């Protein structure tokens, strides 16, 4: 393998890895803070991709249209997520009824999927890249597509923003404290319900952002729901439930490994995430080191 080929696969793998991270980060954040495994994450990702096709179609395949999709779609999804948390999930926290949470998020995924089919039909849609992002750069003899570079940079910025929010702000401090003792925070006058709503909305927004970013990479179809949900769960389990650092490392590692496997054996490439997860679980176990030390308490 030449050095240029190595770089080609590395760039492609990093791009894939950060796309995986967007969907997994939202899933992991909601689990780590709220203790809710959001089975609607794949549907949210799919919805983000479809909404991106609408925004870009109305604004033209321009840089401005793509930037508007990046800005508008996650916000719309986050607002819808906030409403879903208030109306559906909030009542389940006190009893920590995981079965009810599973059923509610699963029902939400069916609702989103049904809405997408109703609005867009079942045919495939495509998102054209703006001319400014459709070509590539030559880097040490390798080809780096501009859009891949944008995805990588955006992924780094989003990861940094998540860490800054969690560890550099009062909201992040309260969020982490709510995991340890929600009741105590409530006694101290913190509106924990509002905090949880914000976390869930942020997680939904991240998932929708993943759909927007991934939309130009291929056809946008209803199959995106499963295509996004399964890898996101694999990343979360591989990195450790509730461990945001682990999710980032797992997503990027899986993306890079899958890229190199694709070069050698395209038929085996889809098995890469499962193989990596299996090896990691055998070596480490399923828990890993959590971003947040304990699961949400049942009280408060």
For the regions a language model picked out, list residue spans one by one.
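Inter-helical junctions in multi-pass inner-membrane proteins, predominant
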Residues: 2-12, 166-170, 196-236, 258-271
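Membrane-interfacial amphipathic/re-entrant helices at transmembrane-helix boundaries
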Residues: 1-23, 51, 63-70, 96-102, ...
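Cytosolic-side transmembrane-helix boundaries in multi-pass membrane proteins
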Residues: 119, 180-187, 191-194, 264-300
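Transmembrane helix-bundle core of multi-pass membrane transporters
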Residues: 92, 98-168, 195-198, 260, ...
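Short loop segments and helix-boundary regions at transmembrane helix junctions
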Residues: 32-37, 79-124, 168-170, 226-241, ...
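Membrane-embedded helix boundary and interhelical linker motif in transport proteins
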Residues: 11, 33-83
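Short, non-helical or kinked segments that cap or interrupt transmembrane helices
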Residues: 27-49, 66, 95-100, 171, ...
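Helix-loop-helix "hairpin" substructures at the membrane interface of multi-pass membrane proteins
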Residues: 143-220, 244-250
């Amino acid at each position: 393998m030449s050095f240029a080929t190595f770089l080609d696969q590395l760039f492609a793998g990093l791009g894939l890895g950060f796309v995986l991270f967007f969907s997994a980060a939202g899933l992991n954040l909601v689990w780590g803070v709220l203790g809710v495994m959001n089975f609607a994450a794949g549907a949210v990702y799919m919805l983000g991709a479809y909404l991106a096709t609408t925004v870009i179609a109305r604004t033209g395949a321009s840089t401005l249209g793509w930037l508007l999709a990046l800005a508008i779609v996650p916000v719309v999804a986050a607002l819808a997520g906030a409403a879903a948390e208030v109306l559906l999930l909030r009542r389940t926290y006190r009893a920590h009824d995981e079965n009810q949470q599973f059923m509610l998020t699963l029902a939400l995924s069916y609702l989103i999927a049904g809405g997408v089919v109703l609005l867009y039909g079942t045919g495939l849609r495509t998102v054209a890249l703006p001319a400014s992002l459709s070509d590539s750069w030559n880097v040490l003899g390798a080809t780096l597509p501009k859009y891949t570079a944008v995805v990588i940079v955006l992924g780094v910025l989003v990861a940094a923003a998540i860490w800054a929010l969690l560890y550099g702000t009062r909201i992040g401090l309260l969020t982490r404290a709510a995991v340890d003792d929600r009741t105590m925070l409530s006694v101290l006058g913190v509106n924990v319900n509002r905090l949880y709503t914000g976390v869930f909305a942020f997680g939904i927004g991240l998932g929708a952002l993943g759909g927007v970013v991934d939309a130009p990479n291929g056809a946008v179809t209803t199959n995106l729901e499963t295509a996004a949900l399964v890898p996101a769960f694999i990343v979360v389990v591989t990195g450790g439930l509730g461990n945001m650092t682990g999710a980032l490392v797992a997503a990027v590692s899986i993306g890079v490994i899958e890229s190199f496997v694709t070069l050698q054996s395209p038929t085996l490439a889809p098995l890469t995430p499962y193989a990596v997860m299996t090896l990691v679980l055998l070596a480490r176990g399923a828990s890993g080191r959590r971003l947040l030390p304990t699961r949400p308490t049942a009280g408060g």
